[in-house]
Regions:
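Extracellular parallel beta-helix/beta-solenoid repeat domains
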Residues: 1-126
Length: 126
């Protein structure tokens, strides 16, 4: 799904009960020819900060996913202090099946956030 993929082997992610916890991706240098850098599902306490993302031209982009970061059914997500070098692809964060309050993106972030319909409002409990 991405350079870093966090995909638990569970049948249906539940945003109220994430499978993984406390994952920090900090102070790395990514050199990618394609869009997705991080894809995370069902994580409570995900930090992506202080990373440098640089555009590579070694290959043509091939992945159908166009977001640089996708978070799905996660809680307590922080994205801050990242920088781009060159014409980096995937300058968006796609937020899926989450409430807005679960994602904190630092002011001045180079990322644009795209909320899906589920993220705009919390799921109703039955």
């Amino acid at each position: 799904e991405a350079v870093i993929s966090i995909l638990p082997e569970i049948p249906e992610p539940d945003p109220s009960r994430p499978f993984h916890r406390n994952i920090r991706i900090e102070d790395n240098h990514f050199c990618s020819a394609d869009y997705p850098i991080l894809f995370a599902t069902s994580v409570d306490g995900l930090t992506f900060s202080g990373n440098t993302i640089e555009r590579s031209y070694d290959f043509r982009p091939w992945h159908p996913r166009k977001a640089g970061i996708t978070v799905d059914a996660c809680r307590n997500v922080t994205i801050s202090g990242n920088e781009f070098i060159g014409e980096v692809l995937g300058r968006t964060v796609s937020v899926e099946n989450m409430h807005r309050r679960e994602v904190k993106i630092a002011p001045g972030s180079p990322y644009k956030v795209v909320w899906n319909k589920e993220a705009a409002r919390p799921k109703l409990q039955k």
